[in-house]
Amino acid sequence: MLSSLSPYMANPRNTLSQVLNFGLVLSSAFMVWKALSVITNSASPVVVVLSGSMEPAFQRGDLLFLWNRSPRVDVGEIVVYNVQGKDIPIVHRVMRVFPDVPTTGAKDVEGVEASQKLLTKGDNNLSDDTELYAPGQEFLDRKTDLMGSVRGYVPAIGYVTIMLSEHPWLKSVLLGFMGLMVMLQRE
């Protein structure tokens, strides 16, 4: 088995170049992700629909593009939010917008900054999302809970992410395959 690696050990400069190329690809992907985060003002500018709660608008596995620079959210808009204490983004439609409620600690020119409050519901669900919110939470806060509003989507391409989440061993296989391809690449 080690004899098959001998051509790569004979030329360490070429091997180092291939490893650096692999690192360059990974760091470039990271920089693109961070640039998208800054442009969209969202920590996660691209998310995958994980359930069927928004059918027929979005199917499980659809890839959504978010925008979080709008100062307000309107009724009927599809938003992505995180529930406090959980790390799974939820994609649902805004059903009701409550009057702006002053937040504590944050002040603007007039003295108190208001934060929009929202009630959401999945298109394919029978009831609103109050059961999904954190205990004691009756609505979402626009500034703290929302990741962004959906501005576009690509159908079904997110199934790769779902497969990697549901079958963790696939991550190892995929990373190993990518590393092997970089190492076996001839220039």
UniProtKB/Swiss-Prot annotation:
Which Cys pairs are S-S linked? none
Membrane-side (Cytoplasmic) residue stretches: 1-18
Instruction: Give the main EC class.
Output: hydrolase
Q: How does it sit in the membrane?
A: Single-pass type II membrane protein
Topology: which residues are Lumenal? 40-187
Report the SUPFAM superfamilies cross-referenced here: LexA/Signal peptidase
Q: Which Enzyme Commission number(s) are on file for it?
A: 3.4.21.89
Q: Which residues are glycosylated?
A: N125
Q: Which GO terms describe its biological process?
A: signal peptide processing
List the catalysed reactions: Cleavage of hydrophobic, N-terminal signal or leader sequences from secreted and periplasmic proteins
Where would you find this protein in the cell? Endoplasmic reticulum membrane
Which ranges does the record mark as transmembrane?
19-39
> Which family does this protein fall into?
Belongs to the peptidase S26B family.
Free-text note on domains in this protein's UniProt record: The C-terminal short (CTS) helix is essential for catalytic activity. It may be accommodated as a transmembrane helix in the thinned membrane environment of the complex, similarly to the signal peptide in the complex substrates.
The molecule here is called Signal peptidase complex catalytic subunit SEC11
Q: Which organism is it from?
A: Ajellomyces capsulatus (strain NAm1 / WU24)
Highest lineage ranks of the organism? Eukaryota, Fungi, Dikarya, Ascomycota, Pezizomycotina
